Amino acid sequence: MRPLARLLYRLEIEGRVPPGPCIVAANHESMLDPPLLALTASQPLHFLAKVELWRYPPGAWLMDALGGIPIRRDRRDLISLGRAEELLRAGESVAIFPQGTVRGGAWSRGAARLALRTGAPLVPVRIVGSRQALSGRRIRFPRLRVVVGEPLLVEQGRPTVATARALTRVLEERVDALR
Protein backbone atom coordinates (compact mmCIF):
# COMPACT_ATOMS: atom_id res chain seq x y z
CA MET A 1 0.00 0.00 0.00
CA ARG A 2 2.91 2.34 0.73
CA PRO A 3 4.12 2.47 -2.93
CA LEU A 4 0.60 3.29 -4.16
CA ALA A 5 0.18 6.02 -1.55
CA ARG A 6 3.59 7.45 -2.44
CA LEU A 7 2.63 7.51 -6.12
CA LEU A 8 -0.88 8.96 -5.80
CA TYR A 9 -0.28 11.41 -3.00
CA ARG A 10 3.44 12.06 -3.20
CA LEU A 11 3.53 10.65 0.31
CA GLU A 12 6.47 11.54 2.50
CA ILE A 13 6.93 9.71 5.81
CA GLU A 14 9.48 11.04 8.28
CA GLY A 15 10.35 8.67 11.10
CA ARG A 16 8.82 5.38 12.21
CA VAL A 17 6.71 4.26 15.12
CA PRO A 18 9.07 2.31 17.40
CA PRO A 19 8.50 -1.43 17.86
CA GLY A 20 6.86 -2.64 21.04
CA PRO A 21 3.88 -1.36 22.96
CA CYS A 22 3.21 2.35 22.51
CA ILE A 23 0.40 4.85 22.15
CA VAL A 24 0.46 6.63 18.80
CA ALA A 25 -1.32 9.99 19.08
CA ALA A 26 -1.94 12.12 15.99
CA ASN A 27 -3.87 15.14 14.79
CA HIS A 28 -7.00 14.25 12.81
CA GLU A 29 -7.77 15.95 9.47
CA SER A 30 -9.69 13.37 7.43
CA MET A 31 -10.73 9.74 7.03
CA LEU A 32 -7.40 9.12 5.27
CA ASP A 33 -5.57 9.55 8.58
CA PRO A 34 -5.91 5.98 9.95
CA PRO A 35 -4.40 4.26 6.90
CA LEU A 36 -1.68 6.93 6.71
CA LEU A 37 -0.87 6.37 10.37
CA ALA A 38 -0.77 2.60 9.85
CA LEU A 39 1.96 3.09 7.22
CA THR A 40 4.29 4.50 9.89
CA ALA A 41 4.36 1.33 12.00
CA SER A 42 5.98 -2.04 11.43
CA GLN A 43 3.44 -3.70 13.74
CA PRO A 44 -0.37 -3.55 13.64
CA LEU A 45 -2.01 -0.58 15.34
CA HIS A 46 -5.30 -0.96 17.22
CA PHE A 47 -7.28 2.22 16.54
CA LEU A 48 -9.72 3.70 19.02
CA ALA A 49 -12.55 4.77 16.72
CA LYS A 50 -16.00 6.24 17.14
CA VAL A 51 -18.61 3.60 17.93
CA GLU A 52 -20.76 4.85 15.04
CA LEU A 53 -18.41 3.06 12.60
CA TRP A 54 -19.77 -0.25 13.96
CA ARG A 55 -23.44 0.58 13.29
CA TYR A 56 -23.59 -1.01 9.82
CA PRO A 57 -22.32 -4.51 8.95
CA PRO A 58 -19.64 -3.49 6.41
CA GLY A 59 -18.16 -0.93 8.80
CA ALA A 60 -18.35 -3.30 11.75
CA TRP A 61 -16.67 -6.08 9.77
CA LEU A 62 -13.86 -3.78 8.60
CA MET A 63 -13.26 -2.27 12.03
CA ASP A 64 -13.19 -5.71 13.68
CA ALA A 65 -10.85 -7.06 10.98
CA LEU A 66 -8.49 -4.14 11.62
CA GLY A 67 -8.54 -4.65 15.38
CA GLY A 68 -10.47 -1.46 16.05
CA ILE A 69 -11.68 -0.52 19.51
CA PRO A 70 -15.10 1.19 19.54
CA ILE A 71 -15.24 4.24 21.79
CA ARG A 72 -18.14 6.46 22.78
CA ARG A 73 -17.05 10.05 22.40
CA ASP A 74 -19.97 11.60 24.29
CA ARG A 75 -18.64 10.46 27.67
CA ARG A 76 -15.64 8.82 29.31
CA ASP A 77 -15.65 5.30 27.93
CA LEU A 78 -13.84 3.26 30.59
CA ILE A 79 -14.60 -0.06 28.88
CA SER A 80 -12.84 0.96 25.66
CA LEU A 81 -9.91 2.48 27.54
CA GLY A 82 -9.70 -0.75 29.57
CA ARG A 83 -9.51 -2.78 26.35
CA ALA A 84 -6.75 -0.48 25.05
CA GLU A 85 -4.90 -0.91 28.35
CA GLU A 86 -5.13 -4.72 28.04
CA LEU A 87 -3.67 -4.57 24.53
CA LEU A 88 -0.78 -2.35 25.67
CA ARG A 89 0.01 -4.68 28.57
CA ALA A 90 0.01 -7.59 26.07
CA GLY A 91 2.70 -5.84 24.00
CA GLU A 92 0.41 -4.37 21.31
CA SER A 93 0.28 -0.76 20.11
CA VAL A 94 -2.73 1.54 20.18
CA ALA A 95 -3.49 4.56 17.98
CA ILE A 96 -5.70 7.43 19.04
CA PHE A 97 -6.77 10.78 17.63
CA PRO A 98 -7.10 12.87 20.83
CA GLN A 99 -9.18 15.52 19.02
CA GLY A 100 -11.82 12.85 18.51
CA THR A 101 -13.05 14.29 15.22
CA VAL A 102 -11.77 15.70 11.93
CA ARG A 103 -13.35 19.04 12.81
CA GLY A 104 -10.79 19.63 15.54
CA GLY A 105 -11.54 20.62 19.07
CA ALA A 106 -10.15 20.15 22.55
CA TRP A 107 -7.84 17.20 23.03
CA SER A 108 -9.18 14.45 25.26
CA ARG A 109 -7.00 13.09 28.06
CA GLY A 110 -7.47 9.42 27.07
CA ALA A 111 -4.02 8.94 25.52
CA ALA A 112 -2.32 10.54 28.53
CA ARG A 113 -4.36 8.44 30.96
CA LEU A 114 -3.41 5.25 29.10
CA ALA A 115 0.27 6.22 29.13
CA LEU A 116 0.22 7.03 32.83
CA ARG A 117 -1.60 3.79 33.70
CA THR A 118 0.63 1.51 31.59
CA GLY A 119 3.96 3.31 31.28
CA ALA A 120 3.72 2.92 27.49
CA PRO A 121 5.48 5.71 25.58
CA LEU A 122 3.41 8.30 23.74
CA VAL A 123 4.44 8.72 20.11
CA PRO A 124 3.40 12.12 18.67
CA VAL A 125 2.54 12.13 14.96
CA ARG A 126 1.61 15.02 12.67
CA ILE A 127 -0.38 14.37 9.47
CA VAL A 128 -0.25 17.18 6.90
CA GLY A 129 -2.39 17.47 3.75
CA SER A 130 -5.06 14.81 4.24
CA ARG A 131 -7.83 17.41 4.65
CA GLN A 132 -7.08 18.76 1.16
CA ALA A 133 -7.17 15.23 -0.30
CA LEU A 134 -10.83 14.74 0.64
CA SER A 135 -12.21 18.26 0.46
CA GLY A 136 -14.85 19.25 -2.06
CA ARG A 137 -16.73 17.01 -4.45
CA ARG A 138 -13.79 15.27 -6.00
CA ILE A 139 -10.79 13.42 -4.68
CA ARG A 140 -7.57 15.37 -4.94
CA PHE A 141 -4.03 14.05 -4.81
CA PRO A 142 -2.02 16.63 -2.87
CA ARG A 143 1.34 16.08 -1.27
CA LEU A 144 0.92 14.30 2.07
CA ARG A 145 3.38 14.27 4.95
CA VAL A 146 3.35 12.10 8.04
CA VAL A 147 5.92 13.11 10.65
CA VAL A 148 6.64 10.79 13.57
CA GLY A 149 8.16 12.51 16.59
CA GLU A 150 10.37 11.22 19.37
CA PRO A 151 8.48 9.11 21.92
CA LEU A 152 7.49 10.75 25.18
CA LEU A 153 8.58 8.40 27.94
CA VAL A 154 6.07 8.28 30.76
CA GLU A 155 6.48 6.86 34.23
CA GLN A 156 3.73 4.44 35.13
CA GLY A 157 1.54 5.50 38.01
CA ARG A 158 -1.93 6.44 39.08
CA PRO A 159 -3.14 9.21 36.77
CA THR A 160 -4.72 12.27 38.32
CA VAL A 161 -6.75 14.82 36.40
CA ALA A 162 -3.88 17.31 36.78
CA THR A 163 -1.15 14.96 35.52
CA ALA A 164 -3.30 13.74 32.61
CA ARG A 165 -4.17 17.32 31.68
CA ALA A 166 -0.50 18.40 31.82
CA LEU A 167 0.67 15.41 29.78
CA THR A 168 -2.08 16.02 27.20
CA ARG A 169 -0.90 19.62 26.85
CA VAL A 170 2.72 18.46 26.31
CA LEU A 171 1.55 15.88 23.75
CA GLU A 172 -0.50 18.47 21.85
CA GLU A 173 2.49 20.85 21.78
CA ARG A 174 4.75 18.05 20.49
CA VAL A 175 2.32 17.17 17.69
CA ASP A 176 1.89 20.85 16.75
CA ALA A 177 5.68 21.30 16.62
CA LEU A 178 6.05 18.53 14.00
CA ARG A 179 5.79 20.52 10.78
What would you call each of these model-derived segments?
Residues 9, 43-45, 66, 92, ...:
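A structural micro-motif
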Residues 2, 35, 60, 112-113:
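Active-site phosphate/pyrophosphate- and oxyanion-stabilizing loops and adjacent acidic/basic residues
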Residues 7, 40, 65, 87, ...:
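Conserved catalytic core of Hanks-type protein kinase domains
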Residues 8-16, 32-34, 81-83, 109, ...:
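A generic local structural motif
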Residues 2-21, 154:
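A short, well-structured juxtamembrane/interface segment
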Residues 79-179:
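Non-catalytic C-terminal accessory region of glycerolipid acyltransferases
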Residues 1-9, 60, 64-67:
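Short hydrophobic helices that act as membrane-entry/anchoring signals
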Residues 16-75, 83:
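Catalytic core of membrane glycerolipid acyltransferases/transacylases, capturing the structured
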